[in-house]
Amino acid sequence: FLPEEIRQKILEHLHSVIHYEPVIGIMGKSGAGKSSLCNAIFQSRVCATHPLNGCTRQAHRLTFQPGERRMTLVDLPGTGETPQHDQEYRALYSQLLPELDLIIWILRADERAYAADIAMHQFLLNEGADPSRFLFVLSHADRVFPAEEWNDTEKCPSRHQELSLATVTARVATLFPSSFPVLPVAAPVGWNIPALVSLMIHALPPQATSAVYSHIRGENRSERVQKHAQQTFGETIGKSFDDAVARFSFPAWMLQLLRKTRDRIIHLLVTLWDHLF
């Protein structure tokens, strides 16, 4: 029933979404905890942790494929080491910027020296980076004052630490304006990682949402986040259908029939989402 060109456009878009390979940048100064956060979020150990500052000297592409889905993390070198390195990093970041679906920017919750990060963030905005593609995360939440009160049994901050984290979060939100809230995490013990995953899935562009979700560790998933990924998938297919139909001039009765067909196709594909991703 569907015109061949419309059918072909929908199939092409469906294929591109199902096989989309997301690219996420992980930024932050050396020692911010980038590798630990990656390992806490995703199914595979995608970044090698290292105790020494400055261990990431260049952008490392970490492409992994636990099943049929490919995804790439770009582990970006830390800022604020030396002026010479920062200049090199700026050129590198400008080159990589267009291909990144999202940039997760990691700042230590237990320090206040954010000047290098602020300067680099402003530079990227001046280079045309989309502000809505930045997600700011506070790492090492377990080390904020008073660090000795961290609850090792429950793996969560004490009441006093919660107040400290609220203060730091508010300050960082002011220094780094973003479309999304700043989240504190303690990656090694998994504290607040599911909340970060939820925020990340909402921050991703529509074509990347389902593909990224398929790489998330099981303990970080939730029914609500999965429904969002499914809904976003359906919306992208619907938009593809609408764009294809808009290329033609159809009579009113045909448009009404096409709308019904559109809804059936979306419902079917969303139902099959578990099998597609």
Tell what function each PLM region has:
Residues 56-59, 76-103, 107-126:
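Switch II of P-loop NTPase G domains
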Residues 142-211:
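Canonical P-loop GTPase G-domain recognition
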Residues 40, 99, 116-123, 164-171, ...:
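Alpha-helical scaffold elements adjacent to nucleotide-binding pockets in ATP/GTP-utilizing enzyme cores
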Residues 1-73, 272-276:
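Conserved G1/Walker A P-loop phosphate-binding module
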Residues 29, 75-77, 136-142:
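Short loop/turn segments at strand-loop or loop-helix junctions that form parts
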Residues 69, 98-103, 129-134, 176-181:
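Short glycine-/polar-rich loops that comprise or flank the Walker A/P-loop
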Residues 185-188, 197-204, 218-277:
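P-loop NTP-binding site
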